[in-house]
Amino acid sequence: MHLRSKPWASDWLAEHSDIVIDQDRATAQIGQWQSLFDQEQPIHLEIGSGKGQFILGMALAHPEINYIGMEIQETAIAIAARKSFDQVGTLPNLRYIYGNGNGVETYFEKGEVSKVYLNFSDPWPKKRHESRRLTYKSFLKSYEAVLPEHGEVEFKTDNRHLFEYSMVSFMDYGMRWTPEDYTLDLHADEDKVQGNVETEYEQKFMAKGQPIYKIKAHF
């Protein structure tokens, strides 16, 4: 969903370039992302961070991991980063990329990212837009290019069609998972919901009684 523009967004992002990296700088940062964090530790990347509730929650819950939230919408990335900054200042283990998730391999070297998260991605329901889905084969190739061998992609959605499409896409690409790695109703599963950090969309869909689908797939 496209957010209404915020007049303050552009200036705020420019003033906080230490925590929000634009696309050009992100490309130049390849192989050197650890230098932006206080400590060298595994980097987890969320593609399509929206307003940032998930990535902030994860960074607060797991200080032993460095997190990067990537978002293409200026308003969304500004809201996410400012919310984080206003609540807790500059977190030592959280940075953002204001950029496109298409071509993520131009930002990171092989193995530089330890895990990729996709949360409530745009389903792009029309067949002619299939290649825009973040679980389409060209995106999977990009994720594989930055993850270590057998790297993991974690995907959550409320959209049953997109979930089924994604499972087929993962399988066709050669990715694997076990029965313990997926659920058709996350919040009805006491074991799998442990440690779950909710997104803004997730909370909205839960309030409507819609099931949340989740899978962890490995290359």
Curated annotation (Swiss-Prot):
Origin superkingdom: Bacteria
Keyword Coiled coil attributed: no
Gene Ontology cellular-component terms listed: tRNA methyltransferase complex
UniProt catalytic activity: guanosine(46) in tRNA + S-adenosyl-L-methionine = N(7)-methylguanosine(46) in tRNA + S-adenosyl-L-homocysteine
Keyword terms of this UniProt record: Methyltransferase, S-adenosyl-L-methionine, Transferase, tRNA processing
Binding residue positions for S-adenosyl-L-methionine: E46, E71, N100, D122
SUPFAM superfamilies from the UniProt entry: S-adenosyl-L-methionine-dependent methyltransferases
Active site location: D122
Pfam families named in the record: Methyltransf_4 (PF02390)
Family: Belongs to the class I-like SAM-binding methyltransferase superfamily. TrmB family.
NCBIfam families per the UniProt record, alphabetical: PRK00121.2-2, tRNA (guanosine(46)-N7)-methyltransferase TrmB
Function: Catalyzes the formation of N(7)-methylguanine at position 46 (m7G46) in tRNA.
Protein name per UniProt: tRNA (guanine-N(7)-)-methyltransferase
Organism from which the protein derives: Leuconostoc mesenteroides subsp. mesenteroides (strain ATCC 8293 / DSM 20343 / BCRC 11652 / CCM 1803 / JCM 6124 / NCDO 523 / NBRC 100496 / NCIMB 8023 / NCTC 12954 / NRRL B-1118 / 37Y)
UniProt lineage: Bacteria, Bacillati, Bacillota, Bacilli, Lactobacillales
